[in-house]
Amino acid sequence: MNEEQRKASSVDVLAERDKKAEKDYSKYFEHVYQPPNLKEAKKRGKQEVRYNRDFQIDEKYRGMGNERTFLIKTYGCQMNAHDTEVIAGILEALGYQATTDINTADVILINTCAIRENAENKVFSEIGNLKHLKKERPDILIGVCGCMSQEESVVNKILKSYQNVDMIFGTHNIHHLPEILEEAYLSKAMVVEVWSKEGDVIENLPKVREGNIKAWVNIMYGCDKFCTYCIVPFTRGKERSRRPEDIIDEVRELAREGYKEITLLGQNVNSYGKDLQDIEYDLGDLLQAISKIAIPRVRFTTSHPWDFTDHMIDVISEGGNIVPHIHLPVQSGNNAVLKIMGRKYTRESYLDLVKRIKDRIPNVALTTDIIVGYPNESEEQFEETLTLYDEVGFEHAYTYLYSQRDGTPAAKMKDNVPLDVKKERLQRLNKKVGHYSQIAMSKYEGQTVTVLCEGSSKKDDQVLAGYTDKNKLVNFKAPKEMIGKLVEVRIDEAKQYSLNGSFVKEVEPEMVIQ
């Protein structure tokens, strides 16, 4: 559904705050919201995507934020962090100024994550903590946005139980924030503006990037994989690729501004370009084009093994500014569990992909994601995950207990692995993760590595910290002037998840950019 169609069919619905908790909200959801539905969602076709390059904030909204401040609390993935940069850009264009003091902020937005129950619980706790602030300062605006806003159960819970919230908007209509804010200021009711269908791809949105060293670059939106445990295809919508020329222009501008590293973002970056109907162009082609731009480091995330092509492997193997680090979520090492998860690959095909990657990129660092305690996972099936970890020798992994998400196919399965069993398995897995991380780190002792210095260490302000091209954290002492620069560091000590070293020298740009 594009912007014109949406305007023609939109229905303005406001939820009255002073109604009783028993109020029936079904009419609201009938008109503007559809709860997650796998059967219906999978029917979504390859509709034409419209690209809006003429976005601009209406003059009548400029100045709305003069002498007002804002604060955004962000939960979740890199995509959410990037959305926060866009939201901040729009707010500053309206005249608002950022603040870090939640007690004085005039607009407080909570950008939410729906991937796990724990993340949602943190958000509800945060909203609850703001109730006293709303009583003390009734003129402030409190908003909830992000992936949780796309869930019916969440919106319903906020409407019924959190009257301190002034506005709710989702992942598809961030560019309508000026109108949402205006309505929130003028209305005595909670403003709910959630789109269940994707809109146009909006280019040239203002952004306030976090720092001037590393930058996120969105290359696509949404996901069509429908893994049975995942809510993302519902909260982020169908896959929509940005045009390559728009992405390349953005990366060139970041290079001109002096950024040292970019990360190409998407729920499944390996699907990039599949929906571009007029050209054959994939992530490998995009990486090739970006490799010619004078920016020292280029990363991409997140990858799905099913879509990882030999073309991509070949491009990464050529080196240059494409880093030799690939995050390749496996989730489980057992075929039966992978099938129930809807991952579309097998243990054998995953290991074959790993072999092809290692053959072409011998110095590659592989990391992964793993879910423990999926419904019906037996001890033997879990042990196959452990043996797969041994076979691959991942340098790091992000590990999680299975978290049931309403609206997903997995939510209909009986969560029949006891919590104590899940925790015990996670502990065993994490022990293995630490073991292989230590092995990977130990290889750096005595070596000199190139580090992108990002700032002071979180533990010691007198120590600087940064990351290698393989995403290894390095702590070292050096002049503060090195922040934002590529430097050489000799590694003196390898810890399990970080490295300590001694500053050698600054790296000249021509030594890095090829």
Swiss-Prot record:
GO cellular component: cytosol
Transferase is among the record's keywords: yes
Catalytic activities: N(6)-dimethylallyladenosine(37) in tRNA + (sulfur carrier)-SH + AH2 + 2 S-adenosyl-L-methionine = 2-methylsulfanyl-N(6)-dimethylallyladenosine(37) in tRNA + (sulfur carrier)-H + 5'-deoxyadenosine + L-methionine + A + S-adenosyl-L-homocysteine + 2 H(+)
Cofactor(s) it depends on: [4Fe-4S] cluster
Subcellular location: Cytoplasm
Entry-linked InterPro entries: Elp3/MiaA/NifB-like_rSAM (IPR006638), Methylthiotransferase (IPR005839), Methylthiotransferase_CS (IPR020612), Methylthiotransferase_N (IPR013848), Methylthiotransferase_N_sf (IPR038135), MiaB_methiolase (IPR006463), rSAM (IPR007197), rSAM_horseshoe (IPR023404)
Top-level taxon in the UniProt lineage: Bacteria
NCBIfam families documented for this protein: miaB-methiolase (TIGR01574), MiaB/RimO family radical SAM methylthiotransferase (TIGR00089)
Known role: Catalyzes the methylthiolation of N6-(dimethylallyl)adenosine (i(6)A), leading to the formation of 2-methylthio-N6-(dimethylallyl)adenosine (ms(2)i(6)A) at position 37 in tRNAs that read codons beginning with uridine.
All residue ranges annotated as the Radical SAM core domain in the record: 209-440
HAMAP family: tRNA_metthiotr_MiaB (MF_01864)
Annotated gene: miaB
UniProt keyword annotation of Lipoprotein present: no
SMART domains named in the record: Elp3
Domain MTTase N-terminal: residue ranges: 68-186
Oligomer and partners: Monomer.
Keyword field: 4Fe-4S, Cytoplasm, Iron, Iron-sulfur, Metal-binding, S-adenosyl-L-methionine, Transferase, tRNA processing
Listed name of the protein: tRNA-2-methylthio-N(6)-dimethylallyladenosine synthase
Binding residues for [4Fe-4S] cluster 1: C77, C113, C147
GO molecular function, one term: N6-isopentenyladenosine methylthiotransferase activity
Species the sequence originates in: Staphylococcus aureus (strain MRSA252)
